[in-house]
């Protein structure tokens, strides 16, 4: 599919950078945590960039992604065979157990890394500076294998970094990248800042794992999510982090694997809060996250080869979730998805669409690319309309005192929409609504407030 490859851009998200300053600057002990969310990227006064931002011209094989997709233009990347990460080179390549403090790891050569941990080595690094400049020349290697990243973990290595500063100022320079089963990077009390396109904050592929705690991550480029997984799946666990993106197609979270985030403050200034592609997941708890573009969350399948087909999953509990976009709070297309919402505050000032399940011409085969969502709400207030097209379905299950204020399938276009209400859950209509079936534990129907509108149940 020509369309499929392009929006994958969304996933090329995470990290541009500032440079280090003198070693004395390492004396900082970064403190992060529950800072208020800001709509703009906060100034980074501690570190100054070592050089001007790279030339805006992208390498031949680095394809502009989200904007081209949105305008319908087709711009296929040149295919490349992914390289074996064991052949990658860098400033410091460590293959044996080692403990380091107060080090600098700088690299300015294209397709090299500042640091590589390999060969099942256990490596501990404290109070150090990592900086990367020099654009990637191979989009697939940098996105999927971690070439040209600042910090790379491969071959089952276990790398721990704390009290440090990680920056990049080049295209395709992810900040912290783990690839391959058993490869783990643990990072704590660290500042991360990337400036180039396709430069994510924490990234994992092919069953690699990155665990982050007490982090500040800022990305400025397009396709640069702060938390991301890509081809072959990967795992990201983030806790107590401040996350900010300012590039197009750079959500706070992009999952082609499994990403869990707890107690984060996140802002995507030109993108959605989060995106799940294929049989993968986002779990978000006790957090405050905001997106300014498109939808709140998108769950989809591109068939680009980066994500297995299956159920896309979103689980959100005890968060404040804000979308300033004009799309839907949850948009599902070309996949089957499940969303579990529990006790969240949902804010959507610029749209009245809570859920949209519909085909999208960018992905899938016409007539077969609808969205299919099961939405479970527990102790959850929901405000907004539920819409679906003729090849899409929505199933809403409300329990434990949940409420919906909105119209369901008001244009009667959906293939199928079903509702279940517990006795203590309520639905207040704001427009005529059409559903295939309605299961209500309150046999009197007193928990449904028609508000003067028509409710039509097909299977009655």
Residue positions per predicted region:
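Bacterial N-terminal signal peptides
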Residues: 16-25
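Bacterial Sec-dependent N-terminal signal peptides
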Residues: 1-17
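Sec-dependent signal peptide cleavage junction
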Residues: 27-44, 49
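All-beta strand scaffolds that present successive hydrophobic residues in beta-strands
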Residues: 94-102, 122-127, 158-163, 184-190, ...
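Post-signal-peptide, soluble extracytosolic/periplasmic N-terminal scaffold domains
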Residues: 100, 117-195, 203-212
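N-terminal segments that cap or nucleate solenoid repeat domains
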Residues: 65-137, 455
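Extracellular beta-strand/beta-solenoid scaffold signature
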Residues: 81-89, 109-116, 138-152, 170-178, ...
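Surface-exposed loop/turn positions within long extracellular repeat scaffolds
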Residues: 409-416, 429-440, 458-459
């Amino acid at each position: 599919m020509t369309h499929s490859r392009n929006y994958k851009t969304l996933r090329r998200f995470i990290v541009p950078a500032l440079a280090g300053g003198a070693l004395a600057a390492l004396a900082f002990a970064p403190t992060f945590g529950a800072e208020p969310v800001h709509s703009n990227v906060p100034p980074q006064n501690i570190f100054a960039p070592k050089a001007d931002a790279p030339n805006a011209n992208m390498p031949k094989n680095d394809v502009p992604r989200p904007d081209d997709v949105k305008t319908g233009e087709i711009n296929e990347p040149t295919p490349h065979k992914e390289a074996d990460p064991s052949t990658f080179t860098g400033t410091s390549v460590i293959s044996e157990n080692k403990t380091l403090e107060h080090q600098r790891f700088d690299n300015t050569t294209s397709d090299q890394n500042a640091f590589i941990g390999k060969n099942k080595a256990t490596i501990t690094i404290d109070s150090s500076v990592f900086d990367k400049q020099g654009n990637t020349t191979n989009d697939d290697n940098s996105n999927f294998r971690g070439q040209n990243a600042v910090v790379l973990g491969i071959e089952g290595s276990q790398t721990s970094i704390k009290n440090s500063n990680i920056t990049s100022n080049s295209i395709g320079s992810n900040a912290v990248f783990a690839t391959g089963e058993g490869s783990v990077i643990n990072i704590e009390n660290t500042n991360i800042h990337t400036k180039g396109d396709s430069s994510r904050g924490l990234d994992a592929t092919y069953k690699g794992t990155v665990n982050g705690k007490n982090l500040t991550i800022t990305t400025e480029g397009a396709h640069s999510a702060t938390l991301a997984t890509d081809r072959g799946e990967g795992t990201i666990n983030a806790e107590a982090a401040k996350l900010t993106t300012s590039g197009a197609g750079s959500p706070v979270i992009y999952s082609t694997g499994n990403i869990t985030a707890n107690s984060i403050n996140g802002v995507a200034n030109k993108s959605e809060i989060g995106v799940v592609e294929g049989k993968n997941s986002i779990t978000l708890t006790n957090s405050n996250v905001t997106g300014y573009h498109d939808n709140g969350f998108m769950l989809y399948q591109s068939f680009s080869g980066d994500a297995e087909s299956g159920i896309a999953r979103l689980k959100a509990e005890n968060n404040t979730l804000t979308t300033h976009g004009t799309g839907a709070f949850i948009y599902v297309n070309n996949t089957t998805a499940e969303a579990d919402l529990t006790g969240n505050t949902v804010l959507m000032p610029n749209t009245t669409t809570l859920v949209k399940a519909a085909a999208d011409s960018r992905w899938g085969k016409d007539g077969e690319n609808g969205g299919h969502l099961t939405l479970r709400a527990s102790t959850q207030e929901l405000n907004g309309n539920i819409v679906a097209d003729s090849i899409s379905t929505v199933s809403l299950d409300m329990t434990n005192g949940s409420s919906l204020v909105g119209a369901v399938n008001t244009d009667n276009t959906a293939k199928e929409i079903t509702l279940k209400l517990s006795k203590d859950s309520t639905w207040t209509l704001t427009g005529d609504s059409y559903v295939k079936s309605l299961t209500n534990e309150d046999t009197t129907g007193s928990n449904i407030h028609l508000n003067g509108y028509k409710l039509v149940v097909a299977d009655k």
